[in-house]
Every structure is written in C-alpha cells, then in structure tokens.
C-alpha cells in the first residue's frame, strides 16, 4: 500500500496562514534538527512542520526560565573559592533551555527508526553539581501503520525531571564597615554556600573618621585548631602596613584591644568543614590622642590635653635655656601627632645676668658643643642697693685640670673671694661686697666629668640673705628675713640633716650688719638606717655627689604586716667591684632577692613579706677608674594580692573593664553621660606594681556652649569669651548688609545634653528692597504665597484644569532699588482646542490595542478549525483507537538551582 500524498491548501490560504502565524513565531519550540546529534549517530531527516504541529507545540510550551535575580552576583560577599573552581552558574546548552521542545512530533519517513540522540546524551550536568545517572538507551520506535492507508505517525512520551533547590542567602564574609559602633560575627559556617568552597578566607575592614581609633572587645570566641583569627591595626594608606595586634592564641573572651589608627582589620580563615562556633566581637570608635611628650633633661613639660587641640608647654630648670619650640600643639590625623620635635634644655658656657634675683649657674654638659676644654665666664648683676649670696649646691672638680674662681665685682680685675686651687668649698656660701659677682670656670680635658651648680640670690643690705637647703625645706617666721627672723630646716626623704640633731634652726641677728647666727645645715644621703614609712627613697652615700670608697651600708625597710614592699630601681651606676645586695626579709641572713653590680637598667623587685634589707658594699682603697654615680631606689608598700585596688565608677558616668578581675594589664575605660565631660585620663591600666597608671577621672557637667563662630560680612560681641551658661553673643552686619536671623544668641543649660545656643547663627545678606506679590492670576494659583519676596527668590504660577498658562511660569525677584520681577505674571485662559493625540488615553488606548488583538486571535482559531476539518482530523487530535509505544525521554536541566524534583509525562498523538 502506498503512502498517500499530503494535501496542501491553495496559495491564497497559504498567504493568509503565513500572515496570521507571525504572532506565534517567538513562542515556538525548538525543532529536533536544532539539537546536536551524538557523534557517529545517523542524522535523521525531519519533515517540515505544518501549522497544526507548530500550534500544538506552542500550546504545550512551558513557562519562561527562572534565572538569577538581578544583583545576586555572589562575588562581593562569598568567600574566595579554591583555584580552578568558579561559583558562576554555567550557561545551559540550547537543547536544555526550558520551553525548547518538551514535546516534538514530526512525520517520520519509512526506514527511519530514530529521531536523533536521546536526552541523556544531550544534557550534561554542570561541573561541581550532582545529577541522577542517565537512563539506558531508548529502544527504537517502530513506525505505526494505521488502517485505512492513513499517514504514518510517531508518538513520543517525554518525562521531564525538574530539580528544585531553595536558594540561600550568600554568606557575608568580606565586608567594609564604617559605622562608629557595632558587632562583627563569624559567617554562618553551616550554610550551603560556605560548604561549597574548600577554604573560607574572610577579611572585615573597619574604618572610622581620622582622629579616632577602634576598640574591640571579644565577647565570644570558640574556634577549632584549624581556624585562625588575626587582628591587625593600620593599613589602607601608602607606606602604612598593617601591624599585628593579636592572633587566635592571644585572644580570649572579655579581652580588649585598641588600634592606634582609624583602621582595623579582622582576618578569619576556616577549613571547609568548621568545627567551632565562631566569634562575636564588639567594636567602637574612641578619640585618639598624641603620646605624652618626653620630659626634657633638666626641665619639665605641662600638658593641657593629649587629644587634638591640646598643647604641651616646656620649661627648663634654673640655669638651663630652652632650645626649640616652647609650645607644641596636638594635631588631628590618622595618628595624631605634635607639631614638632620636643625641645631640649642646655646649660650655657658663660653670659651676663642683669637684675639678678634668684637663679643658678650650671656647667655645660661634658663633651657638648663647647668641647672638652672650657673657659666660661659669668657676670651676675643685682639691682642697685642689693648684694648677692652664692651657694655651692654641687661641686666636683678635677684637682689638676679644673679651676673655679669667684670675684666680688663685675670685672676680671675684681678681688678674688674664692679660688678652688687654694680654698675649700664654703659651706655657708659667699656674700658679695658689691652688687655684682664675677664667676670664671677653666677646664682642660679633665679625667673625671665636671659637675658644677651654684645658686645665687639677691637680698637687701638691711636684712639677712634668704637661707637655702639643698634636698630639704626651709620654713621661716619672716619671709623678708629681717633681724630676729628664725629659719627652720628639714630634709627630703632619703636625706638627713648634717650635723644631726638640734638645733635645726638659725636666727638673723645684728640690725646694723644683719647676718645669721649659725651656718646653714646640709642634707646628705646617709649610709644605712631603719625606714618604716609607707613610701620613701634609699640613696647612695653623699648622693648626688659620688660616694667614697670603703662603704658598708645596711638599710632596713619595714611596712605593715599585711603588706609587702615594691622596690623600684630608678638609677644604679656603681663602680666595678661594688655591689648592692637585696635580702627578702629582716636582716642580711634572709634569702637573697637580688645582687646588683655595675650599671643596671630600671627594674622592679617585690618582697614576699613586710620586710626588706639592703646592703651596699664598696671596698676600701683607691677607687677604680671611672666615676661611680651611685643609686636611687624608691620603695612603697603594696597589697599582697595580685589585683589592683577597686575603683568605683564616676558619678554621672560609667567604666568598662577588660577583665572581670583587676589583674595586671587590666584596662579601665571611662565615659561620661551626655552633658558631662571627663576630667582626667579616660584609660587606666593596672600596672606591674598593682597600682593604677593614673588617678581615676571624674565627670563634670559641661557648663559652656561651643563657640558659635563668626559671620561673614559682620562681627560679633560676646559677654564672656568662654561662653558659659547665661552668656550672650550679639551679631551685627556691615553697612549695606542686613541680618537674617536672631541678632542675640543666649547659651542656656539643658537637663540632658550639653548647653545649647538659643538660636542658629544668623547671616548677613545684601540689603535690597523686597518685591511685592504680583497677585494671583484669575483661574490660577501660585506657590509659596506671601506678601514680600526677597531678592533672588522665585515664584511659580499654575492654572486650574481646563485653562492654559500664557506667559512665564516662573518669575524671579531681581535685586535693585527697588527690586523688580523678571517679567509680568502670566494669564490663565480657557483651553480652546484639545490635542487629538491626548484623546487616546486610558480606556480608549486599551480598547485600541485589545480590539485588533482579539480579532487576530479569533481569526487564527477559525483558520485552525477550518484547516483541521479540511484534513479530516479531530479538533484536538485525540484518538482512542490508536495504540502507543511510549518513548520516555528524560531531560535534566543543568541549572545549579534545581536538583531532585518532580516528573511529568505528556502523551500526545497527531
């Protein structure tokens, strides 16, 4: 039996069918000939699809593919994947795109048993995903030969497997944080996204404003041995590399760390299968400060504030001159710093001192700018009618190479009253016969360092000179030291009066020629003694002079029974062969705590009980070469426990501690409530000696307003330059300008918060006459209606519905005398005509679109029904008389968002 020929419609019908089928082109499924066949397989011949087949395939077409949402690129937040692995979803082959042929039917010629490669041969799972194993090869489908000589057809049942996966949020790993306070937590290590990588490598970058640092506190820390957390400070600027603050082994819960810059990095690494619960860290910004400037040798420094804007003022001891800037300012920056290098204090070699009242002459440092050979001459001149008293505070001269001469007068020819080559050092000092003294120092390469300190003071001729006691204090009954005045002497800790015992007072006698009835005593460091004060100092014999050989001194230190002794070695420089021994107990028979020889750096020693014994031994005989300066040891009693004393929180504030117990290294951070400022250091540290680094601060209510500032083209007057509560600031403008705003601002207090000004700072604007309101047009309105408009202000006009605006929509007030509008106000006229293009709006537009579309659809359905009847087939192609040989084709979408889903079967016959 031959195959009947296919009937074709006439040309006019074909033309109509082509025009009507254009609307279906976009939604047609792919044909089987677009799929790539398996290499080596036979390429089938596919017959051209007629209109019925195209319409049938479109009716069974699936919905659009669901792809990645916009902005779901996981790269900014996910951890870095291992080398060679990518997190981007691979593109799908054309044959696997949803909706591209879930059902294909075609006329199969005789002898063709296959329609192309099977679905498992075309669908390949993307890398890194798992998919069900492909089914076995499909059996060849024999052609069906219906009775009655009908056309041979092929029926296919396609099984579509849809894989569905719940899309999880990406793991927040790499992150830049700029808030002033918050929390940093480890990523959710149990999520699918984090398990898809072999190594989790996260960096959290926290940065705040310049001038602020970052303080972190570890609240939770539970990491496995394979996990690592690094805390780094700095970075982010050229030449500023991050500096490691701590790692996992150094961190603990409750620990507080501070970054000295405005940037801090947290670097976290975790294996593919983490075992710990991660970390939680609280961070907050704090105000950075400049470091405390170093105190110059022979001088001191006073600091108003270490925060930006604070000042450091330097000054030198008497007899020294300041070299450098006297005042430095703390400047704000990534790391606040002072405006310059700290100055130094140097002693000058010679000079003239006019109108001398009280001061010192000090020898220059050995080996300085003056070199080893010195020739220094000083002239000290007091006011008319006064004389000078010169006290020898410290003198150490080389007998062979140094010489000191003092003359009573102001020239080298004045009479000599002291010569070091011939006279001993006068204990009572020297008194000039005139109003001047001439001091000359000669030194030629001395074997020992030169030490010289002379104190001078001027006094009236009708009274005694003011007494002086080095390393001690003087109290008197008459500050003017007239005849009859008494002066009483006492020594500083570590010194004792010499000669010892009473009398420790002298009297000014003889009204005709006033003088003291006895010499001033001296305070000298003694060799040994018993000390039972809570705090004190132990000095080497004759300190600050060099000790002499043949010393064997023993000091006993005793404090309360429940205390122990902290000994701090400030200076230790003894000769070779000399030794200082410390015994942990009462007497030299106790356990040896330490033996100190030669030069030693600063160190601290702690006794186990309330007693400590010190023994210094210097063998007799000529001293070894070199000068033994001696030693200075400070001691004080401390508690026996290992914690610093408890400090209460400040009133109107609070404090936070880095540790629960106040152990060594604990940091206390103080803060005040709004409206209060902190007086003192905001950070206290428990030091090694179990004392706090500074006194606890206090919170003081802020009673001043911030400086409101000046105004342009004007000036101000303030009732108080400090702007306290209740003060006033009055503003005035220059001629030609007018004040906009309140002329007087008042600083008033608030219960909560800092004091505030009563109003904003005014402005000075050019003085012009305002423009009058031009009026509202009939059938219209204007915005911002008011009677007067200042120069530069604009006014907009609008018309009601049904009216059109004739003229300028916006007019502006132009400054002048008088000010004028840029144009006349517009008019609102009735709309005469309507634009035809605007009639097609709303429902009319929808009707214009939907009516032709509906006609096309109805016409297409009619053509389809007509064509179906013409071919003699049922309307929908269903037939109960056919037998089927189902072919199951399984498609596996290679989209990583889907896995393990549902299965659908479609059974179609044409």
From Swiss-Prot:
It is found in: Cell membrane; Endoplasmic reticulum membrane. Residues 173-286, 349-459, 527-638 form the CUB domain. Glycans are attached at residues 222, 332, 373, 473, 517. GO terms for biological process: adult locomotory behavior; cerebellar Purkinje cell layer development; synapse maturation. The chain crosses the membrane at residues 845-865. Its main location: membrane. Residues 288-347, 462-525, 642-701, 703-766, 769-830 form the Sushi domain. It is a single-pass type I membrane protein. Keywords: Cell membrane, Disulfide bond, Endoplasmic reticulum, Glycoprotein, Membrane, Repeat, Signal, Sushi, Transmembrane, Transmembrane helix. Disruption phenotype: Mice lacking Sez6, Sez6l1, Sez6l2 exhibit motor discordination, and PCs are ofen innervated by multiple climbing fibers with different neuronal origins in the cerebellum. InterPro entries: CUB_dom, SEZ6_CSMD_C4BPB_Regulators, Sperma_CUB_dom_sf, Sushi/SCR/CCP_sf, Sushi_SCR_CCP_dom. PANTHER family: PROTEIN CBR-CLEC-78. This is Seizure 6-like protein 2. It comes from Mus musculus. The lineage of its organism: Eukaryota, Metazoa, Chordata, Craniata, Vertebrata. The gene is Sez6l2.
């Amino acid at each position: 039996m031959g195959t009947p020929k296919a009937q074709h419609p006439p040309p006019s019908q074909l033309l109509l069918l082509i025009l009507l089928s254009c609307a279906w082109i976009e939604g047609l499924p792919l044909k089987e000939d677009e799929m790539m066949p398996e290499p080596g397989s036979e390429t089938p011949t596919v017959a051209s699809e007629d209109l019925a087949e195209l319409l049938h395939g479109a009716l069974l077409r699936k919905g659009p593919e669901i792809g990645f949402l916009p902005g779901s690129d996981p790269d900014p937040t996910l951890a870095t994947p291992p080398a060679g692995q990518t997190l981007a979803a691979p593109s799908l082959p054309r044959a696997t795109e949803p909706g591209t042929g879930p059902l294909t039917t075609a006329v199969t010629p005789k002898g063709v048993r296959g329609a192309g490669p099977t679905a498992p041969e075309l669908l390949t799972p993307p890398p890194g995903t798992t998919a069900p194993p492909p089914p076995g090869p499909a059996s060849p489908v024999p052609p069906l030969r219906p009775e009655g000589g009908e056309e041979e057809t092929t029926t296919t049942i396609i099984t579509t497997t849809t894989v569905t996966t719940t899309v999880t949020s990406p793991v927040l790993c790499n992150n830049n944080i700029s808030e002033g306070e918050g929390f940093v937590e480890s990523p959710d290590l149990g999520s699918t996204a984090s398990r898809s990588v072999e190594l989790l490598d996260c960096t959290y970058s926290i940065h705040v404003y310049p001038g602020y640092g970052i303080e972190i506190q570890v609240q939770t820390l539970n990491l496995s041995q394979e996990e690592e957390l690094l805390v780094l400070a700095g970075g982010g600027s050229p030449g500023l590399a991050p500096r490691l603050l701590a790692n996992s082994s150094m961190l603990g819960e409750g620990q507080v760390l501070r970054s000295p810059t405005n940037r801090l990095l947290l670097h976290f690494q975790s294996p593919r299968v983490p075992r710990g619960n991660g970390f939680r860290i609280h961070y907050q910004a704090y105000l950075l400060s400049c470091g405390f400037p170093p105190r110059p040798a022979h001088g001191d420094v006073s600091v108003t504030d270490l925060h930006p804007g604070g000042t450091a003022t330097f000054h030198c001891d008497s007899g020294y001159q300041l070299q450098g800037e006297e005042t430095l300012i703390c400047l704000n920056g990534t790391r606040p710093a002072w405006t310059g290098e700290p100055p130094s204090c140097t002693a000058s070699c010679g000079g003239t001192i006019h109108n001398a009242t009280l001061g010192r002459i000090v020898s220059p440092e050995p080996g300085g700018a003056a070199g080893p050979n010195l020739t220094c001459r000083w002239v000290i001149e007091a006011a008319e009618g006064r004389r000078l008293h010169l006290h020898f505070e410290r003198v150490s001269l080389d007998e062979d190479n140094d010489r000191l001469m003092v003359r009573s007068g102001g020239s080298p020819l004045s009479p000599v009253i002291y010569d070091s080559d011939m006279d001993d050092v006068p204990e009572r000092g020297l008194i000039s016969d005139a109003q001047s003294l001439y001091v000359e120092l000669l030194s030629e390469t001395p074997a020992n360092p030169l030490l010289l300190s002379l104190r001078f003071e001027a006094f009236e001729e009708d009274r005694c000179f003011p007494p002086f006691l080095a390393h001690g204090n003087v109290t008197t009954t008459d500050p003017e030291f007239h005849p009859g005045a008494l002066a009483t002497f006492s020594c500083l800790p570590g010194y004792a009066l010499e000669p010892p015992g009473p009398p420790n007072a002298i009297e000014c006698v003889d009204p005709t020629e006033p003088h003291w009835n006895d010499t001033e005593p001296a305070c000298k460091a003694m060799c040994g003694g018993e000390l039972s004060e809570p705090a004190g100092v132990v000095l080497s014999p004759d300190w600050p002079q060099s000790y002499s050989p043949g010393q064997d001194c023993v000091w006993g230190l005793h404090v309360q029974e429940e205390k122990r002794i902290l000994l701090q070695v400030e200076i230790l420089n003894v000769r070779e062969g000399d030794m200082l021994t410390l015994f942990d107990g009462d007497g030299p028979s106790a356990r040896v705590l330490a033996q100190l020889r030669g030069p030693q750096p600063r160190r601290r020693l702690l006794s186990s009980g309330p007693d400590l014994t010190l023994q210094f031994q210097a063998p007799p005989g000529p001293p070894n070469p070199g000068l033994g300066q001696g030693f200075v040891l400070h001691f004080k009693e401390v508690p026996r426990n290992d914690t610093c004393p408890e400090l209460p929180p400040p009133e109107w504030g609070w404090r936070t501690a880095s540790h629960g117990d106040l152990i060594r290294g604990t940091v206390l951070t103080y803060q005040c409530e709004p409206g209060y400022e902190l007086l003192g250091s905001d950070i206290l540290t428990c030091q090694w000696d179990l004392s706090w680094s500074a006194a606890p601060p206090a919170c003081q209510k802020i009673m001043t307003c911030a400086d409101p500032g000046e105004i342009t083209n004007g000036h101000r007057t303030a009732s108080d330059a400090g702007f306290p509560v209740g003060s006033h600031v009055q503003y005035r403008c220059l001629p030609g300008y007018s004040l906009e705003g309140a002329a007087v601002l008042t600083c008033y207090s608030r219960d909560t918060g800092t004091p505030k000004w009563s109003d904003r700072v005014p402005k000075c604007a050019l003085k012009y006459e305002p423009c009058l309101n031009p009026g509202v047009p009939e059938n219209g309105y204007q915005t911002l209606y008011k009677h007067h408009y200042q120069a530069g202000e604009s006014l907009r006009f609008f018309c009601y519905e049904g009216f059109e605006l004739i003229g300028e929509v916006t007019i502006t007030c132009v400054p002048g005398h008088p000010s004028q509008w840029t144009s006349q106000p517009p008019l609102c006229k009735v709309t005469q005509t309507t634009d035809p293009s605007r009639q097609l709006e709303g429902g009319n537009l929808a009707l214009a679109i939907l009516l032709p579309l509906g006609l096309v659809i109805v016409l297409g359905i009619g053509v389809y029904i007509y064509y179906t009847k013409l071919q003699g087939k049922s309307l929908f192609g269903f037939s109960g008389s056919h037998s089927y040989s189902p072919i199951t084709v399984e498609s596996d979408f290679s989209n990583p968002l889907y896995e393990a889903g549902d299965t659908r079967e479609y059974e179609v016959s044409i």
